Amino acid sequence: MNSNEILQILRQHKAELIKRYDVNHLSLFGSTARNQARANSDIDILVSFNGAATSSRYFGLQFYLEDLLGHPIDLVTEKALRIELRPYIEQEAIRV
């Protein structure tokens, strides 16, 4: 799957993600965003929740996205993003 296909699927399910998991916004980053992903690559997604990133929200969203996209998801919250990686991720991130 390329980045356009993934973004299209995520956009189609955005309302459900907001309703179920109280997502503020999602961004695609990493090898998939750069269209350099291999068949066994995970999909890197940066998420911001409205409110706390509870275990229920975080893991619920991760499992939902894995089922939806059929690939492992590396889900990173904006608050947990390491400061030294932030500029690189923000530069390549594609907002859903």
Where are these regions (language model features)?
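Short hydrophobic/aromatic beta-strand micro-patches
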Residues: 46-48
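Conserved histidines in hydrophobic membrane contexts and catalytic metal-binding motifs
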Residues: 28
